[in-house]
Structures are given as C-alpha cells and as structure tokens.
Amino acid sequence: MSEKQVFSTEWAGKTLSVEVGQLAKQASGAALIRYGDTVVLTAAVGSKKPRPGDFFPLTVNYEEKMYSVGKVPGGFLKREGRPSDRATLTARLIDRPIRPLFAEGFRNEVQITSTVFSVDQDCSPEMAAMLGSSVALVISDIPFEGPIAGVDVGRIDGKYVINPTIEQAEKSDISLTVAGTYDAINMVEAGAKEVSEEAMLEAIMFGHEEIKRLCEFQQQIIAAVGKEKREIELFVSDPELEAEVKAASEGKMKAAIKTEEKKAREAAIEEVKEEILESYKAKELENEAEILGEVAHILEMIEKDEMRRLISQDKIRPDGRKVNEIRPLSSEVGMLPRVHGSGLFTRGQTQALSVCTLAPLREHQIIDGLGTEEYKRFMHHYNFPQFSVGETGPRRAPGRREIGHGALGERALQYVIPSEEEFPYTIRLVSEVLESNGSSSQASICGSTLAMLDAGVPIKAPVAGIAMGLVKLGDDYTILSDIQGMEDHFGDMDFKVAGTKDGITALQMDIKIDGLSRQILDEALTQAKEGRLHILEHLTSTISAPREELSAYAPKIITLNIKPEKIKDVIGPGGKQINAIIDETGVKIDIEQDGTVYIASQDQAMNRKAIAIIEDIVREVEVGEVYTGKVRRIEKFGAFVELFKGTDGLVHISELAHERVGKVEDILKLGDEVTVKVIEVDQQGRVNLSRKALLEKKEQPEGDKKPQAEKKFYPKTKKPESK
C-alpha cells in the first residue's frame, strides 16, 4: 500500500474523502479524512505481543492543533499542552464504540491517535476522527470486528438532520451523537431540550441509517486496501484448571454473591477468592505467579457468570431488589452554612454532595479551542476521591472519567438554567462523590438540582438522572433500573438517562456487547422514565421550588440599562470614574456594549448606592423638570448649580428673582441649596435654569410691564487656539 488511494462519498451534503497509502505508512493502519475543509489524520498501531494483565490496553488520543484554525496557542510556551476538556471528551467518544469490537481475551496493546490538521466549523472534526479511527483499524492487520461509524443528529422543527451546521445546531432541540456497526447501535451521547423518549429513539434510529451507509462505504475501502489480519494470542484459561477452580468455589461464590450489603458482599467474595488462592499457593508450583494470576481471573469469571445467571434466570439482583426497583433515597439541602447552596443526595450506597456557587457574569469561563470562542456562565464539575469506594491512592488532577461525568451532568442541567437576562449570574456546580456503588454521575445530577434550588436559582424544572443496566444471555435479556457497581462491572450496558418530568435532557449509553436492537433501546428508555419520575417525586418532596432569597453570602446583582453613548461617561478618562465608584462602594461593575450594566456585591445597600451614582452620571435633564442642587460656582453673570453628579446648570442673574438683582451673592452663596427649574437645554447640551420661575410674582402696575425678549444666558465660549 505504497501508493496513495482516494475513496470518496457524500456525507450530509459535503464531500467525504478517505486517503490511504501516503501518510503515516509505518503505522499498522492510517487514514487521512477530508470532510469539507476539515482534515484529520488517524493512525492505529497494535503491538505484536500481548501485554501482561487482565485487561485490554486500548488507548485513544484526539489531538487538537491550534494551527488547524489559524490560531497561536496562548501561554508563555506558545505550544499545545495538556488536552482540553473537549479533546478528552472526544477521545472517550471514539473509544466507547470501538472497545467492544475487540475479541474477549485480547491483550495486545492498541493505540489510536487522531490529529486535527484543519477545521471547517460546519464539518465536525470529532466525527471525522471517529470515522478515521474505524478506517485505520479495518485496513490494518489488527484483528477488529468493525467497521463502525458515528454521526451527529439534530432536530429542527420536527425534522431530523445529520451532522447539523453551527447555525442548524442552535435551532435544534436535540444534540445527539450516535455510533455503531451496520447491524446495531453501541454508543449514544445526547443533550436535549426536554424531548420525549419516542423522539429520542427516532433520532437514534435515524442516525443508524446513516451509520449503515458509512459502514458500507468502508467495506469498499477494505476490499481495495485492507491487510490480512494477523494471528493474535487471546487470553484463554486452561480448561482443566478452570474446571478444578469452579468445582472448589462455585457453591461458595453463589452464596457470597447473594449477600445484600455491598461491603459485606465484597468481604464474602474476597474470602472465597483468598481461600482458593491460598490452596494453590500451598502447592508451591514452579510457575506459581502465572498460575495464581490465571486462578484469580477464573474466580472473577465465576463471580461474573453467577451474577449474570441470577439476574437473567432467577430475576434476583445481588442486593435483593427487583429488576425495576430503585434503591432507598434520601436527600437534604442547606447543610453547608457559608456556601450559596448545597444539596446532599443519597441513593443506596451512592452519595453525592453538590455545591452551587453564584458569581458575577465576569467570572464566566472563556473557551478558546478549535471552535469559535465561547463564554460559559454555567459549569458542573465532578470529583471522585478514592475514599468514596474505601480505597487509598494519590489525588491527581481530574482524569478522563471525572471530566466525562462532569460534562454529562452539565449537559443534563444546561437546558433548565435560566437565561442571563432572567438571572444575571455565573453558576458553578461542584459535585463531590462521598460514597459510590454505581450511578454516581446520576447522583451528582440529583444533588446539583437540590443545590441550585437551595441557592435560589430559578431553574425551569428539577432534573433527575438514573443509570440503567442490561444482562443479555443469547436472545434473553433483562433490563435493570438503578444499577449498582457490580451490575455495571459485570453487565452488558450502562445507559444513563436524565431529564425533567416532561422529557429527556441528557443521554449516555455504553455497552460491552456488539450492539443493541431498537426493541431493547425502547424498553430501556420506557423503564428509565418510570425510575426518573420516582426520583423527581423524592427531590421535590425535599425542596419543591427555588428559595425566594439568595444566601446572605451570595453576591446580589442589580441590572441597569444605559444608553451606549453614555458608557464612556460611566467609565471616565482612563477608567477614573468607574474606579472611583468601585472604591466608594466596594461593588463589582460589568458593562456590556449594549449598555447593560451589572452591579454586584454582597451588600445590597452598596449596590443601590452604586446604581444611584451611575444614574446621576447618565441622567439627562429635561426642560420643565425641577431640581434641588448646590451652588458650586458663582460668576458675575450668574450661579452654577450642580443638579446631580456630573451635571451643572446656569442660573443667570436675571433668573434669580422677579425683581432686579445687583449681585448674585445678594441671593445665593457658594454651597447654598437652591430649587430651580430647567428652562432650556441648548444644542451644545448646556442647561439654563431659573429660580424665579418657582417664585410667586409680585403684582406690578399694568403700565410698568414691558415685553421681555427671549434670552440665551450661557456666555459665548471662545474656540481654543490651535497650537
């Protein structure tokens, strides 16, 4: 495959080209994907020998290059550093549909790297990378049961759209990524605006039709350039050893698995395993380490098979629940006195403490990646410490799993967040997982709903989440509601569904089998809705509506609208005016280009004071209005009176009184308060005032009255001489 070959088709109205044979020729397989003006190179490499361990060492990397959008990376080094959250989430998105399609017992290391070379904003580099990953694998000599493909699906005015453009995505009420093989769906990731289960299922199946077409396209590429698959040594237990271990442990393992409480069950299972392992250690075998590793693997498979048999055949779950039963629920709000809002949610032995923090809009997150620059005023972060599962270990920066679970919670809650106009705050949620026995990401969604209600955030509706599971033996399958850790680990599906009482707001599905049929997806969504409504009922029994007042420790934000041309007056030369207001009141001030002013502090009195100062600065006098101000300057021709901060007017000497005034000082002195009426605002914005207009006029003999000509009182000003 030394010569470049190009394969083309149409994808969502754009040209899709796959180029092989020119780039990255030393990789096991490589493909350059051109989708519109988006260009992504994906290379896959598989090791020749299996790696020690009892897991499949697959690594998927998605590398964003800032040059792909004509940008120079920020920071001192001016080069790409650690992956962005978006890159991390994309790597997970690609990993999830690919991983189930490697054979059981595959232990050779496989690494897939997608590098983004060029980005067309309307042609998703993520979907190009997913397609490239599949192509690189299927044309390589690495055994892989693909191809797979993925597509984005939107819905605009009831019509489904493949790979929506940025403009279309803004109008869509569904943001769905679905992946799978020609025969079945095996990965779903979605956010939505309270859509029905039926609409979501139709979106998934609509996407699958396009996936089928892309898989057929890849078959053409395989036929033309695909390599012969190499022979791989799969990890398989010794049949005699397996039978021996099974005979010694199966009865005890069955009893241990039926222990309902998690820690007690884990202890009982561990006791069975230790007993069997000790019996083999006592034999002092030559290849002891290898045998013990194999025995440990066999014991885990016995544990897995027995749990699956109990659920599938006996309809008994390890903790004794029915297949559609939710674990006991409890929740609490307001347990942290100094934070802005807090919610503790417990479901069985899974517990999440979520905290809501409110901040001025200036605290938003700026995201400057491969897309257009974004401003996020709503964030959800998820933390999973080792103590939550009773283990020790170092605390590191958030990993892929924590970033992924945080993003899922954010997506689930995004739709119910009030608009900036309705609630002008930056909102940050942090979910601390304190206990975990499955479904911790969904517990964080429930805890976050409680925390926002406790903080007084006027969300559109409460949101709850539930994780569904599946055990499939042949054609028989059992769908599980609210899965725990063991069911997640040994089951075939982790299907997370979040939403309000009116519809779905987020969806995430991962499976360990080849794919799922429409029937299973339909039943899982229906069963998930029942569980979600049950949890929502519990949440609203704890707190049914947002608190009417924000925490005393939360910033209070007042919004003021001024004319855009007045912004410069509020800011002042070099920021002098706005800094003086901040120094005087201690508030934070943000001004938008449209003239919207946000004033924030914990002290509402200071907010009001700052508002009053700004209103005075931007206030415009109107003819006929009456003001009480202080005399700031006296001249021979009249007195200058400060009507309000930043605005003076002139009371001409002839407007001080009805009778003739010889000297201004006979009527007014510096610092006097005087009530005046605006009689004119000239074309230059100068304000002429009258004191006598508010005084009762003394009666004058008819013959003494003389007509008065209209007067302009401001003295003429000379133009400054040019230097």
UniProtKB/Swiss-Prot annotation:
Cofactors that this protein relies on: Mg(2+)
Localization per record: Cytoplasm
Molecular functions (GO terms): 3'-5'-RNA exonuclease activity; magnesium ion binding; polyribonucleotide nucleotidyltransferase activity; RNA binding
KH domain boundaries: 555-614
Biased composition (Basic and acidic residues): 693-723
GO biological process, one term: mRNA catabolic process
Residues holding Mg(2+): 488, 494
One Pfam family hit: S1
Domain of life: Bacteria
Record carries keyword Transferase: yes
Reaction(s) this enzyme catalyzes, per UniProt: RNA(n+1) + phosphate = RNA(n) + a ribonucleoside 5'-diphosphate
Enzyme class: transferase
GO cellular component: cytosol
Family statement drawn from the similarity comment of this UniProt entry: Belongs to the polyribonucleotide nucleotidyltransferase family.
Protein name from the UniProt record: Polyribonucleotide nucleotidyltransferase
Organism of this sequence: Listeria monocytogenes serotype 4a (strain HCC23)
Taxonomy of the source species: Bacteria, Bacillati, Bacillota, Bacilli, Bacillales
Encoding gene, per UniProt annotation: pnp
